[in-house]
Amino acid sequence: MGDYLLLIDGSSLLSTQYFGNLPREILYAKKQEEKEAWYHKIMMTSKGVYTNGIFGFLRYLFKIIKEQKPAYLAVAWDLTRDTFRRELYADYKGNRSETPEPLREQFALCQEVLANMGICQLMDEHFEADDLCGSMAKKFESQLPVKILTKDNDYLQLVTDNTTLWLMHSSAEKTLRWTLCWARSASR
């Protein structure tokens, strides 16, 4: 708790909460048509706006703010898959499936909600959320401790004496905390 910067991979948290709050019928469906047949069961507003991911995202965010009380907070977003890495290597993340429409619709709305709450957001169409979090961590870790929340193991390379990683499980309620000593002992 206290005087530190908390960086959240918003794309990772929203996706985790979206999939964690889906009806079982969608999770276990094999074909896209079967999944789409159950979209009406996903949490949504009376106007048909999907909200299951946003609901989980905000619930988790409020819990972190209440329990951890970070002095500074920023949420980073992936805006597109066509970042500088795809320009360098056309097949970068080429094996990923398309983002489901009910999830895709929630990104802009979640960003709007956070903007209305006054939460700092980091986004750039040429960079991924992990690039933005990494840059912020490197910029500020000499001034104050940095903690990063994500589900992405790629962030482990950012762990230092002053940068800690909170790595979410599939169940976003469970979070591993990676510090430099854990990262060093794991590599031995």
Where are the predicted features?
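Non-catalytic, usually N-terminal nucleic-acid engagement modules in DNA/RNA processing proteins
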Residues: M1-A74, F84-E87
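Structural beta-sheet core signal
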Residues: L6, A74-W77, I148, L167
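Residues immediately flanking
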Residues: G10, L79, N153
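Short, glycine/charged-enriched secondary-structure capping and boundary segments
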Residues: G20-P23, Y89-D91, D161-L165
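Extended two-metal-dependent nuclease catalytic cores across DNA- and RNA-processing enzymes
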Residues: K30, H40-M44, G94-R188
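Generic hydrophobic, aliphatic-rich segments that mediate packing or membrane embedding
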Residues: G53, F57-Y60, T80, R85-L88, ...
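Short beta-strand-loop/turn "lid" adjacent to the catalytic site in phosphate-handling enzymes
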Residues: L73-E98
